[in-house]
Curated annotation (Swiss-Prot):
Sites carrying sugar chains: N184, N304, N425, N428
Name under which the protein is recorded: Heparanase-like protein 1
Molecular function per GO: beta-glucuronidase activity
Native species: Arabidopsis thaliana (Mouse-ear cress)
E.C. numbers: 3.2.-.-
Amino acid sequence: MGFRVCVIVVFLGCLLLVPEKTMAQEMKRASIVIQGARRVCETDENFVCATLDWWPHDKCNYDQCPWGYSSVINMDLTRPLLTKAIKAFKPLRIRIGGSLQDQVIYDVGNLKTPCRPFQKMNSGLFGFSKGCLHMKRWDELNSFLTATGAVVTFGLNALRGRHKLRGKAWGGAWDHINTQDFLNYTVSKGYVIDSWEFGNELSGSGVGASVSAELYGKDLIVLKDVINKVYKNSWLHKPILVAPGGFYEQQWYTKLLEISGPSVVDVVTHHIYNLGSGNDPALVKKIMDPSYLSQVSKTFKDVNQTIQEHGPWASPWVGESGGAYNSGGRHVSDTFIDSFWYLDQLGMSARHNTKVYCRQTLVGGFYGLLEKGTFVPNPDYYSALLWHRLMGKGVLAVQTDGPPQLRVYAHCSKGRAGVTLLLINLSNQSDFTVSVSNGINVVLNAESRKKKSLLDTLKRPFSWIGSKASDGYLNREEYHLTPENGVLRSKTMVLNGKSLKPTATGDIPSLEPVLRSVNSPLNVLPLSMSFIVLPNFDASACS
């Protein structure tokens, strides 16, 4: 039986602007073998996730204040483009949380403290006071989230009732009353929450604060009991429990799972900011270095191993990842070049059994998928949307004889039989002709071709557009992504020669492939990304 295959091809380089004579100086061949007989692991159906944070408009880093009005408490939820950008995913998982979530008070029940907005305060965590979520705003958020069809993960305050001991360490029992009142209100209104997450970056040595694994584990048992009681007689589906939303430290995570015990925590989350600080002058160099990008694979592997050994009832998620911390890198995180890091992260994490990957942020900072204020999609938005539409749950093993710069990931196609490949080429000079096989049969041969100019090379893949090739044979779909005008720091992504921008009516543009005969050569350009669909690929794991 024939199967359809999707290939995602991503090309990276080390220059920000690459002239035509530099791209395609070297013609190389590479063979790819997809092991389609079995799935090595599976992601969640809604693997792609984006976050909404709590930062006020005056949150600043490096003398820059890139947040504006983009947070849970102050974002304009009536903007049509924001709604359409989320709806395009059908659905998008949204995680509400961030550094200030452990200072949020919920304005419900018998609240004994004033419910005021976040204000700058030198003695406060991350330089801010405690803040408040009014139920009127919670109602507005849920109306918005329901209208967009979002799958919601909400991060709860895990410091309520605790006190500071020394340094970053906090102690004392968690006060669950305000959280329980908040959950009761949420259920009484019929608001659908997929998952409740407990705390943000309190694990191990912590970031602004830390809580011991012993205390954390015991409090998770309390929270699980609260969730069970609140949802016991409700028609709503009981949400899963997610924790701890911090940076992975093996000993702390192991102890947390041992203390909380079987079936308390459903999902174990960790955060990734493997590119370092947002003002690092080496940020671009790191994105373009395959050996650097590969270093974080050990974290994905170790998290999964810790869960398998000490909490096999739970699943691993990346609960937050923005590449560069402290709001991201200006003119990097919001440009085309960041998709090289982002798509590599999606492929690598999925290969290590990560079920969900939450991008920091949907809106806010320099790393937003959408531009703050205008909500115009940045390049990574389209990378996320194409992944979500084309990459299925099943992860396959794949090998290549290509150089280290050519990185390869494989998935079953989404919503249809077939396989999806993600290829990342970190060379700014090599133009590859790729052959694809299942280890037995060559599906796509690498055919020799003469060296051509960049313009000729781009024209050829875009020559057949439509639902059927002119010769009537089976086609593959190709989605070629390039930066506008060849500038890697461009804020505009180009799909098959067409700039991706909201339409005149304010809609997300359609993402249409070009069609080519499956027998024609598959050519992959430097510094570009491509999704390619191949029919008749023998992958029984994807039937």
